[in-house]
Swiss-Prot record:
Organism: Mus musculus (Mouse)
Entry superkingdom: Eukaryota
Biological function: Involved in an early step of the mitochondrial complex IV assembly process.
Keyword entries, A-Z: Disulfide bond, Phosphoprotein
GO biological process per UniProt: leukocyte differentiation; multicellular organism growth; spleen development; thymus development
Family matches, as PROSITE patterns: CHCH (PS51808)
Residue numbers of Phosphoserine PTMs: 37
InterPro entries in UniProt: Cyt_c_oxidase_assmbl_Pet191 (IPR018793)
Protein name: Cytochrome c oxidase assembly factor 5
Record family assignment: Belongs to the PET191 family.
Motif (Cx9C motif): 47-57
Domain CHCH per the UniProt entry, residue ranges: 27-65
Disulfide-bond pairs as recorded: 30-57, 41-47
């Protein structure tokens, strides 16, 4: 599911995960069929794995150990 862009400039540390999370929410049945907002669908538990990956990426930006290990995410 991750998308890798060679020609696209860097948009930040967690830009790839954030973009994939947004695409997952917009393509979910919750948004398309039920007509709910992506925020409501995220609270209901859709795209949970990407939400957790985005959280881990953001948390690794604040972690001092990430200097040695590198940031999580793509």
């Amino acid at each position: 599911m991750p998308r890798y862009y060679e020609d696209k400039p860097e948009g930040g540390a967690c830009a790839g995960v954030k973009e994939d999370l947004g695409a997952c929410l917009l393509q979910s049945a919750c948004v398309l069929q039920e007509g709910k907002s992506p925020r409501q669908c995220l609270k209901e538990g859709n795209c949970r794995a990407l939400q957790y990956s985005f959280f881990e990426c953001k948390r690794s930006m604040l972690d001092a150990r990430s200097r040695f290990r590198g940031r999580k995410g793509y």
